[in-house]
């Protein structure tokens, strides 16, 4: 009987697609970019202009030359922090309820509402 691989522990993501974030650790520390895609099953995000990798693509047809393409690889969501474009500062978030009863994300340092 073969063993099945357990599903990775899923943690609620604090960022969503389209958010502006800043990288807080790693080789791309300090870079600001937009979240292109989230991968909740692995707690990872793909950020525009961050963690660029190169891939060598073999030629598909005869006579065609190979090429080198670059793409954004995913990084762990714990390495990013939401970024305020108005104040130019990264901040943690908290969840708060507005007067009309909506639950929204708010930056702790600036009080700016994200959603």
Swiss-Prot record:
What's the source species for this entry? Answer: Synechocystis sp. (strain ATCC 27184 / PCC 6803 / Kazusa)
Q: Which family does it belong to?
A: Belongs to the universal ribosomal protein uL24 family.
Q: Which GO terms describe its molecular function?
A: rRNA binding; structural constituent of ribosome
Q: What is the lineage of its organism?
A: Bacteria, Bacillati, Cyanobacteriota, Cyanophyceae, Synechococcales
What are the coiled-coil residue ranges?
none
Q: Matching Pfam families, A to Z?
A: KOW, ribosomal_L24
**Protein's UniProt name:** Large ribosomal subunit protein uL24
State the source organism's domain of life.
Bacteria
* NCBIfam families reported for this sequence: rplX_bact
Which gene carries the instructions for this protein? rplX
């Amino acid at each position: 009987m073969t063993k099945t691989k357990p599903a990775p522990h899923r943690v609620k993501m604090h960022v969503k697609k389209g958010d502006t974030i800043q990288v807080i650790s790693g080789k791309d520390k300090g870079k600001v970019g937009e979240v292109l895609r989230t991968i909740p099953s692995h707690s990872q995000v793909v950020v525009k202009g961050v963690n660029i990798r190169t891939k060598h693509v073999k030629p598909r047809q005869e006579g065609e030359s190979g090429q080198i393409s670059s793409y954004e690889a995913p990084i762990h969501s714990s390495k990013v922090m939401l970024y305020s474009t108005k104040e130019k500062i990264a901040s943690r978030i908290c969840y708060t309820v507005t007067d009309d009863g909506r639950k929204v994300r708010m930056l702790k340092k600036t009080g700016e509402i994200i959603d």
